[in-house]
Amino acid sequence: MRQFVMIGGDMRCHYLAAYLKEQGVYVTTYKVPDCEDEYSSWPMISEAFRNDSTVEERVLLLPVPVAKDGIHINGCTELAIENIAGSLTAFDFVCGGVLPSGLTDACTAAGVPYYDYMKDDCVALKNAVATAEGAIAESFMMSDINIENSKCLVTGYGRCGRVLAQKLLRMGAEVTVTARSVEACFKAEIGRASCRERV
């Protein structure tokens, strides 16, 4: 039997846990929003999974991003990356978004395979769309002016910057992009935004 442990995160983790449970998958959640914790602490979870001989494969599902501050698990501030790294032998596979190098190094040292969702171009692009739409929603709430005919600055022209610039242009904004490379500026200008190369 395959079992999943999901830790922290935001409502995306909640919905993923609910979906997996609907599919008949055994999922243990810890500090996932609006999900009931089966265990009261991380050490209890890792020990329970390490000692359960009925489980064929133990998968640890971490949030996107794994750690916003680089130290603690996103949505679970009492749990640090080093706590997870010290318990990896309880698991057969680790998944998460933007896995910190300290965690991937620990996985490699423990012989535990890992997968970073954000290394998948399709997932990263869909995340960029959600991030861009979130930025636009924040701008609506924080500004008294319309986006149409306004001047907007987008710093960077990676996945998120590219999607954000295009959405703002479609909404009628005058968009300027700052980018580190001539190539990124060229791409921004092809997309109808003006561009200033950052030095």
Where in the sequence are the language-model features?
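Glycine/serine-rich phosphate-binding loop and adjoining beta1-alpha1 elements at the start
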Residues: 60-149
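Alpha-helical segments flanking ligand/cofactor-binding loops in enzyme cores
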Residues: 18, 85-86, 105, 166, ...
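Residue-level detector of conserved catalytic or cofactor/ligand-binding positions
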Residues: 190-199
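NAD(P)-binding Rossmann-fold cofactor-contacting core
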Residues: 23-39, 171-189
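Hydrophobic beta-strand scaffold residues
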Residues: 27, 114-115, 175, 194
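Short amphipathic alpha-helix with an adjacent loop that forms part of the alpha/beta core around
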Residues: 45-56, 82-86, 198
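Glycine-rich adenosine-cofactor-binding loop
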Residues: 4-15, 20, 146-169
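N-terminal glycine-/charge-rich "phosphate-binding" loop or analogous flexible N-terminal tail
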Residues: 2-51
